[in-house]
């Protein structure tokens, strides 16, 4: 179970973060000079101070765009800093974007095999520069926080607190329902029109494992093979790995099922929780949760 709990952390670029100035008016700090806004660097230092766990040297939680010493006029907290999110943030005067997932199409925000002259990538970088925006990623430490910030927000969004197991917060024991009913409930609560399911529609289920985001084949299959897991909910996964494994388990008449929610809806509420948390100690600038739009539409709904 411990292996199932852990997140994979990969090396990233060097940290570009300093210490918070003595004049910063964040919770627990002296009031700053009148009318002075905190810089992005100071906001991040306050996050490091309040997150409740040691800050790791090797992390993707770094600045991805902009000058960290930019005074912050507003903070947009989001699941993914898509072009749409950046445009909405800029229109609202939010020049610091705190994103959970990458901004530039790769875990380290260095898209392999893509030339810097690529039109889409270039326009996104230019937009950030032209609007004086700063992007900082908050992934590893938000997951490592106790409890995991993403998991806490998602469990609250689904209303599953009373079903959560104390010894492993990623496992849930709930009243019996069919797999089809469970999938429909998850889709409705998370606002995801693209939920996909592997398994028998009418199978009665009570024991659920939840793996938000993209945990990978090893952790996903280890979860599915557990005796106390009938259904695994994931954000996204490769179809020729975990999906095929789940399909084979069903063909072998094992009581197993897989629900694929979509990466964004599987973690979105966790970043809404992050915005609520930030407001507890960042008092100098407005903070808003800016939801990332679901990028997919289906033929069945006509794209509505």
Residue ranges and their predicted role:
Residues 2-6, 13-304:
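Hydrophobic structural segments
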